[in-house]
Amino acid sequence: MTITSNISVQNDNLVVQGKTILTKIPDNIILTPVTGNGFVSGSFIGATFEQSKSLHVFPIGVLEGLRFMCCFRFKLWWMTQRMGSCGKDIPLETQFMLLESKDEVEGNGDDAPTVYTVFLPLLEGQFRAVLQGNEKNEIEICFESGDKAVETSQGTHLVYVHAGTNPFEVIRQSVKAVERHMQTFHHREKKKLPSFLDWFGWCTWDAFYTDVTAEGVDEGLKSLSEGGTPPKFLIIDDGWQQIENKEKDENCVVQEGAQFATRLVGIKENAKFQKSDQKDTQVSGLKSVVDNAKQRHNVKQVYAWHALAGYWGGVKPAASGMEHYDSALAYPVQSPGVLGNQPDIVMDSLAVHGLGLVNPKKVFNFYNELHSYLASCGIDGVKVDVQNIIETLGAGLGGRVSLTRSYQQALEASIARNFTDNGCISCMCHNTDGLYSAKQTAIVRASDDFYPRDPASHTIHIASVAYNSLFLGEFMQPDWDMFHSLHPTAEYHAAARAVGGCAIYVSDKPGNHNFDLLRKLVLPDGSVLRAKLPGRPTRDCLFADPARDGISLLKIWNMNKFTGIVGVFNCQGAGWCKETKKNQIHDTSPGTLTGSIRADDADLISQVAGEDWSGDSIVYAYRSGEVVRLPKGASIPLTLKVLEYELFHISPLKEITENISFAPIGLVDMFNSSGAIESIDINHVTDKNPEFFDGEISSASPALSDNRSPTALVSVSVRGCGRFGAYSSQRPLKCAVESTETDFTYDAEVGLVTLNLPVTREEMFRWHVEILV
């Protein structure tokens, strides 16, 4: 069978479905279609060079007049988003790019379908490719090994290009095509998600930073539990390990970041976590902390922090008891793209002091001994931080890709051996060296940290996690980070976590909590109502700039089992500045913005609605409490000030008869209200002809008689407690919970049925709710 592609080079232009995407393609550029039978949607861009070198920077064509969004590393550890329309707008260290164009084969002008084209720079052999732009509007590839001894004169599969009409499916299929080609990583859908995701958690970091102690852990768990939101997973962050005590060097120019050169001197816990009661010398202090958390506070999962290199400054060479890891001082060398973006205090420190790098041949032994000790203490997993440091240490070791892959493979092998629940959170890890080497790790931090004391950071954080999740969410479930429940932006952050599909955890100091807020996220049993997918921007937000353009709201969509959810956020006023190379507020008083939502903003709503869906929906707005019957194709307007939000739950309308329709809403006082719905079943219960009336059902329509014969029994399984809501076009004849008739209220103006579900002692309990209509 002949292979045909919708991506080709014609007259020195890169053409996608009839539309020129890039012009002036150089002669040394090679286009290779994906292998396979029939029509293919993807091709690889490669190149040949006159000289063999360890670093090549070269153009692949000119981009002008097409909107794009990209994810780029603004500093070594983290990505954020950038929007533009020409090559010079593409930042250094761009690892993902999505372009918008029109299909000029299938239509003309505005009638032509929109085509979305993904560019994924890849790893090839010992080299890594990234994109960047120049002042000529050329897209360049920066192709490097990170080791001057590792050279090449060609690369045949440097960037994968994939196109189609659904942007989310295009991204998904492009990563899956690269997975088949590279065979070095797995797509998120193939990975086991750790169970902690469905439980509320607490992290010690912003509560104590490195001053965390055993007593502090106990205080934090106790404080949250007493307020009715018990943490079921715990992260003991940086501060528990044995590290060297270094006096500051008076002659060292780098002082502020001196802590980052500190090295690990033992795999066990430090003195702060040692037992004060030494009656049982066989039990470690860390084990006592974990046992206390699980037995006294009913915590299910405990994770411990460590850096990929052991600690920020690695493992101290020849440290007592750690000699067998063959740690040696190495000095980081950053890639040109990273150096062109934001400087980092960690790297300033390590450039002076060096990092104690465990011999790559011994790194599995290091991880295995560390993790087996942690597992013996009852630890269930690890948060592995500072990962991208490894890419800077490849000189003399085969380069950045080889070194990163050896560390990642050793890490995943140790986690598989020691932690049965695939217990790993990957952090400070936004490089493709690691992403394209991860076959097992299933959780990735989605952005730079939550910074409670930085006013510029909060809108930036929400925008970054959403756009980064477009790319990262194909590899792992994005983690949108901890936040503070008692904070001026707490509700804004909480609402974002509800639509993010991510773990929900806080870093509150003991006693500093907003329990009214937390109870909108956390059920009394400590579980959470988590959306099912990575939260991502809606289609109409993909190429807008909701942090900088002054006009756009950010809309984030996700799915529950039977509904969609769309969160809308005003994120204007701050962003990463390419001139100052840091986050900054560029508008101190961003204006009030107006936008709208539609049912199909939740991109997969038709899949949960079923084949017989008319397109009409019931929309529940969480903050306002409004219930709206939304016809197919219609929209709901909204207005938000900066740092304001709204959550819309979209429930496809189920037509029971010509004049009776129904839609579940869920627990109306929870942020992710419709995430409580576990099942819905509608059974007709009469053969009699139901009463009919002429005209469309609306608030002005006459109600059917309460003495009518029942038409259908709607059965809904609901997880959680509190006020349960549903839409019914007619007042129900009766409602029951666990087969016992219960009181309910009915607002005939909007069709809202509400009833109360009691608290139960059983975890993850599902109430059986019956509504007779």
Curated annotation (Swiss-Prot):
Keyword Glycosyltransferase recorded: yes
Enzyme class: transferase
Any one GO MF annotation of this record: raffinose alpha-galactosidase activity
Signal peptide (from-to): none
EC number: 2.4.1.82
Catalyses which reaction(s): alpha-D-galactosyl-(1->3)-1D-myo-inositol + sucrose = raffinose + myo-inositol
Superkingdom of source: Eukaryota
Induction: By oxidative stress.
Gene3D superfamilies: Aldolase class I (3.20.20.70)
Keywords on record: Carbohydrate metabolism, Glycosyltransferase, Transferase
Gene Ontology CC: one annotated term: plasmodesma
Any one of the GO BP annotations: response to oxidative stress
Reported function: Transglycosidase operating by a ping-pong reaction mechanism. Involved in the synthesis of raffinose, a major soluble carbohydrate in seeds, roots and tubers.
Family to which this protein belongs: Belongs to the glycosyl hydrolases 36 family.
Protein name, UniProt field: Probable galactinol--sucrose galactosyltransferase 2
Source organism per UniProt: Arabidopsis thaliana (Mouse-ear cress)
Gene: RFS2
